[in-house]
C-alpha cells in the first residue's frame, strides 16, 4: 500500500514484478509494506513496517494476487480525498442457505437416503443494473483489472441473473443447488495455499457501454460450516469492492450502524451499547476510529488525550497504531428545512467547537456521523412537532366563526400547587408559562389582570379555562379557597359541555368572556377532557 504510493510519488509508475509471482502474506522475500503510509493526503511514519493498519495481516490474502497500477493522480496536500461510489452492495448478514430435499418419487438406491441440496439467498442494494453470478470452489484471476473467477467444474457455476436498480432486492435461484455430499471437508473452507474460495458471489454493474461504471463490481467471499447433526451453514469471509479496476477490501467499523429502526425494536440487553457518545467522556459524539481494531468509540478531545496517556483501545485493550478521525460534511443548504428537535443532533453543534475547521472544504459544513448515515428527520406535515414548553393543545370550544385551539399551560404546576392548601397565589399571569405561538399584548395584560381580580365561587383548587373571541387573551388561574361547602353542587361534565357548546352563541355577535370551572380532585384522579 505505502510502497506503491511512494513509488508513484517518486515518478515510477511501472511495477517490475514477474507475471507468475503472486502476492501472499507472509511474502517469501522482502517486505510487504514500506516504513511509511499516506492517509488523508499526509505522510506518516510507522514503527511497524509490516503492520497492516486496518486489520490482520492475513486479510491481505483476500486481495488480488497481482498488483495493479493506481489509476488516480496523486491529490494535492490540501485537496479533499476523493470518495469512491459504491453502486452495488450485498448485505452479508442476509446470506443464508436454503435446504431442499429430493422428491420421494426420484429414483434412489435401496437403503439410500434422499440427498439434501442447498441453495443461496441474500439481499442486495443496487444503484445500477447488475448481473449476479455464483461460483463454487473458484479461483480468482485479474484480467485488465477485472476479477475473473473460474470453477474446476462447470456445474459449480450458476447462471447469470440480471437485476434492475433497486433497494432491498432479494436474490433467490432455486435452479442452482449445492450438493455437499460431493464435497471434501477441506473444500468447505478457504484454501490459502491454492487460493480456492468455497463460494464467490459476484455482482457486476451491467450498464452497457457507460465508461464511468465500467469495471465496477462487488464480490462476497464466503465459506461453509458443517454441524454435528450433518447440516450446513454459510459464513461470510470478506467483501471486496472493485472500482475503476482497483480492488478494495471492505472492513467493518465497530460502533456505528444504521439506527433507523433502533427505537422500534426493544433491546434484549439493557447494558448493550446503543448510544453514539464517546465511551470516555460520555458527552461528545464519537468520531475517531482506533486502528487496527477498528473501534469507533472516541471523540476528538479524548482521542488527543489518549495519544499521550495510553496506547490501548478502551474497548478491547489491544495496542493501537493510529487514530483516524472520520468527519462527515455536506454542502451548505440555501434554505434550511424544518427538522424536529433532537438532542443528538443538537449536541453535534456543540461538538463542532472541539474540532478545527481547517480541513473542511469551502462551501461545506460538518455534520455528525449519525446524520450522515440516517439523514435528517424531516417533520411530517400531518404530525406537528413536539412542544418545546409545557404546552398541551385541546381542540373544542369554538368562537362561532373558526375553531380555536386552547393551550393548557402549566398543568403539572397547577396539580402540585393543589396539594399545598392555604398558600397565597399570585393573581398576575406567569410570563414563563406563555406559549411562544400565542403572544400577549398590553391590552391583553389589562384584561387578564381584571379577570384575575374577579371573585371566584367557593370550590377547591380549580382549573379555570377562559374563552374569548380571540385566542390570544387566554390565561390560567388557580383558586385558593380551602374546600367545597357542604350541599354545594359540583357541575357535571354535561353542564360543562352544554355551557361551552357553540349553539348558545350567535355567529353575528362577539362572544363575551365565559368561565368554566373544573374541580381538581387531586393528582391521582385528575383527568381533563374537552371535546366538541
Swiss-Prot record:
Pathway of action: Protein modification; protein ubiquitination
Ranges annotated as RING-type zinc finger: 277-316
Subcellular location: Early endosome
Motif (Required for TSG101-binding): 384-387
Transmembrane regions listed in the UniProt entry: none
Record keyword Nuclease present: no
Expression across tissues: Widely expressed, with highest levels in brain, heart, kidney and liver. In the CNS, especially prominent in the Purkinje cells of the cerebellum. In the skin, expressed in the basal layer of the epidermis and hair follicles, primarily in the outer root sheath. Isoforms 1, 3, 4 and 5 are equally expressed in the liver. Isoforms 1, 3 and 4 are most abundant in brain, kidney and heart, respectively.
GO biological process entries: endosome to lysosome transport; heart development; negative regulation of adenylate cyclase-activating G protein-coupled receptor signaling pathway; negative regulation of smoothened signaling pathway; protein monoubiquitination; protein polyubiquitination; protein ubiquitination; protein-containing complex assembly
Acidic residues: bias regions: 442-453
Phosphotyrosine sites (modified residues): 389
Matches recorded under Gene3D superfamilies: Zinc/RING finger domain, C3HC4 (zinc finger) (3.30.40.10)
Residue numbers spanned by region Disordered: 419-518
Modified residues (Phosphoserine): 428, 449, 452, 501
PTM comment: Autoubiquitinated in vitro.
Lipid-anchored residues (N-myristoyl glycine): 2
Enzyme class: transferase
Keyword terms, alphabetized: Cell membrane, Cytoplasm, Endosome, Lipoprotein, Membrane, Metal-binding, Myristate, Nucleus, Phosphoprotein, Transferase, Ubl conjugation, Ubl conjugation pathway, Zinc, Zinc-finger
SUPFAM superfamilies in the cross-refs: RING/U-box (SSF57850)
Primary site of residence: other
Classification via InterPro entries: MGRN1/RNF157-like, Znf_RING, Znf_RING/FYVE/PHD
Signal peptide: none
Compositionally biased intervals (Polar residues): 422-435
Function in brief: E3 ubiquitin-protein ligase. Mediates TSG101 monoubiquitination at multiple sites. Plays a role in the regulation of endosome-to-lysosome trafficking. Impairs MC1R- and MC4R-signaling by competing with GNAS-binding to MCRs and inhibiting agonist-induced cAMP production. Does not inhibit ADRB2-signaling. Does not promote MC1R ubiquitination. Also acts as a negative regulator of hedgehog signaling.
Subunit-structure text: Interacts with MC1R and MC4R. Interacts with TSG101. Interacts with mislocalized cytosolically exposed PRNP; this interaction alters MGRN1 subcellular location and causes lysosomal enlargement.
Record protein name field: E3 ubiquitin-protein ligase MGRN1
